[in-house]
């Protein structure tokens, strides 16, 4: 029984370590600084136009018209 408990502990510890490593990788995004300082009114292009006043890409808005842009401060764009 002690051997099983040790193996279970090691398995759990390895899963926790993988979670910690993946969260560190996310925080080291080289584009994060660029995305955070983008002007919300003049963000990155979403690749579509909004002649009808609507953008179909998630996280994009029709500002400035007629180009859909993504707000660099929205969590969806990060």
Swiss-Prot record:
Propeptide cleavage-removed residue intervals? 24-42, 72-78
Presence of the UniProt keyword tRNA processing in the record? no
Post-translational modification summary for this protein = This is a cyclic peptide.
Sorted UniProt keywords: Disulfide bond, Knottin, Plant defense, Signal
Please give the positions of the paired cysteines in each disulfide bond. 46-60, 50-62, 55-68
Which region is the signal sequence? 1-23
Could you tell me at which residue positions the Cyclopeptide (Gly-Asn) crosslink is annotated in this chain? Answer: 43-71
Q: Name one Pfam family in it.
A: Cyclotide
Q: From what superkingdom does this record's organism come?
A: Eukaryota
Q: Does the keyword Ubl conjugation apply?
A: no
Q: Which InterPro entries match?
A: Cyclotide (IPR005535), Cyclotide_sf (IPR036146)
Biological-process GO terms, alphabetical: defense response
Q: What does this protein do?
A: Probably participates in a plant defense mechanism.
Q: What is known of its domains?
A: The presence of a 'disulfide through disulfide knot' structurally defines this protein as a knottin.
Q: Which family does it belong to?
A: Belongs to the cyclotide family. Moebius subfamily.
Q: What is this protein called?
A: Chassatide C4
Q: What is the lineage of its organism?
A: Eukaryota, Viridiplantae, Streptophyta, Embryophyta, Tracheophyta
